[in-house]
Curated annotation (Swiss-Prot):
Signal peptide: 1-32
Principal localisation: secreted
Name of the protein in question: Putative cysteine-rich repeat secretory protein 17
Entry keywords, A to Z: Repeat, Secreted, Signal
Span of domain Gnk2-homologous: 39-142, 148-265
Superkingdom of origin organism: Eukaryota
InterPro entries according to UniProt: CRR_secretory_protein, GNK2, GNK2_sf
CDD domains on file: Gnk2-like
Length: 278
């Protein structure tokens, strides 16, 4: 016979196990998206020189850092500020990934700023890439201009295996569609603009079990035409990096980036526009 006490303890244990199982499922769900914010790369703009401690340039930079940190523009995933003039001009551009805005964007800005200042100490210019944002500091105002000089590619060492030709055809289908979304569909999170989001994401079946996931994005200071030009140029420029059928690759620069993997890495529900599925 079971006592009332033992039954009660058993029910409590079951409840605790259920809570643990729920938490594990939530952790698994988040990790399955691979929503990391890893450091990817950086470049110091050595030619722009360094600033001195306590200089007008440093004060301008500190003022911008504070304004972006406490401002509301990060809620949309993008911010651009400039301060000063001549040799003391400071321009800062922050672009967060389309599904990373608000607190995630603010957190990525803090990580990127700390990382750039550590890797490029007192340089007037530099750029750094994380999974969920890019940050550029410069003494030259190049906002709205295409920049291919800082582009690079990172690819998976492994190939997809059989039939890379079929893989590339499906890659083309996926990226044609998400690029179209990026340059035609407005940002649903912004009510006061009709400008397209310059971000697109989606997935394409590779068979009965596998899927390919892709994402394209341009910085918000670009025009639609410039965004399209940037994506096409980088896809062609780095085709040897991914067109052999790599299991994943990404191309990044100051103006635009794209990525694909065989696992989900963006949040389809928090993107600024529709999510492509095929």
């Amino acid at each position: 016979m079971y006592s009332l006490s033992s039954v009660s303890k058993h029910l409590i244990l079951v409840h605790i196990l259920a809570l643990v199982a729920t938490q594990l499922l939530l952790i698994r769900s988040v990790s399955s998206l691979n929503m990391t914010n890893s450091y990817l790369n950086h470049k110091c703009f050595v030619s722009q020189g360094k600033y001195k401690p306590g200089s007008a340039h440093e004060k301008s930079l500190e003022a911008i850092i504070h304004s972006i940190s406490v401002g509301e523009n990060v809620n949309s995933g993008y911010d651009m500020m400039s301060f000063g003039d001549g040799p003391d001009l400071v321009c800062v551009v922050l672009q967060c990934r389309g599904d990373s805005y608000g607190s995630k964007c603010r957190s990525c800005f803090a990580s990127a700023m700390a990382g750039l200042r550590r890797r490029c100490p007192r340089y007037k210019g530099g750029i750094i890439w994380f999974d969920q944002c890019l940050l550029e500091i410069s003494s030259i105002d190049n906002v709205g201009q295409l920049n291919y000089g800082d582009s690079f590619c990172m690819s998976n060492a492994k190939n997809v295996g059989d039939d890379p030709f079929s893989f590339i055809l499906k890659w083309d289908t996926l990226f044609d569609n998400i690029s179209r979304i990026a340059i035609t569909e407005k940002n649903k999170n912004l009510k006061d603009t009709n400008k397209p989001a310059l971000y697109g994401a989606g997935e394409k079946r590779l068979g009965t079990k596998k899927k390919m996931y892709g994402m394209v994005q341009c910085t918000d200071d670009l025009s639609v035409k410039a965004c399209e030009e940037c994506l096409v140029a980088n896809i062609l420029k780095f085709q040897n990096c991914w067109k052999s059928g790599k299991r994943g690759a990404r191309v990044l620069d100051r103006s635009c980036n794209f990525r694909y993997e065989l696992y989900p890495f963006v949040n389809a529900k928090t993107g600024p526009n529709s999510y492509f599925k095929s």
